[in-house]
Amino acid sequence: MDRNIRDVDDVLKLLDGLFAPEADRWTADAAGWWNGFYGDRTKAVPFFVAKPDESLVAYVDRGWVAPGRALDLGCGPGRNSLYLASQGFEVDAVDLSDEAIAWARERTQEAGARIRFHHGDAFELAGSALAGPYDLIYDSGCFHHLPPHRRVSYLALVERLLAPGGQLALTCFASGAMGSELADADFYREPGLHGGLAYTPESLRWIFSDLTEVELRRMRDEPADSPYFGEDFLWTALFRREDTSA
């Protein structure tokens, strides 16, 4: 007899288990899949380029995001981490894949930058290796690979690690352009993430309604010779956590 559910973490792990192992992209058990993904650096994957997101550059150029402590969630080969470090940020970067981390470290060494890389599950590392508060939490393509129930964990991570007055910036699949448009409940009837979840502007505003929206728009499509990364099948969003201490 199995009567092991006692708290929210137990419920989340139970729901994780409803997905076939090969559909897992968000727990430490998914590291092998991501290692295979990052293992061939010659693949024509858009975000393998050594370019920062055009939206991130725009936030910094406009003065919306100022240098401070930054956390890059799902950093991959480190393209956005490197940009942040070049702009004077103190950067922690985390990824499930040690292949991605190794690649990012190589790029960092070549650039002569300083970034603290962490291999593992950000949800498990939050509060220990990933010790906030951070002035910026940056997520380029991690959020849309989470199953619906793990938004609870994501919001808890933001609540725990984002400084008052700090900002959350993310890119994710845009409804009608990329990603699955199944209703949340349907992912538990036919487990699998179908490549990632699409979001509408309304759904993003609702999910992050405890934060203040600064900007929410489609990412600008960047040509191949641009120094920036941009794909118009993505939303790019910037939210601020209000400082209520005053």
Predicted regions and their residues:
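A conserved beta-strand element that flanks and buttresses the S-adenosyl-L-methionine
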Residues: 138
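Class I (Rossmann-like) S-adenosyl-L-methionine-dependent methyltransferase catalytic domain
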Residues: 1-73, 77-132, 146-161, 167-246
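Conserved acidic residues
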Residues: 135
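Short catalytic micro-motifs in class I SAM-dependent methyltransferases
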Residues: 141-145
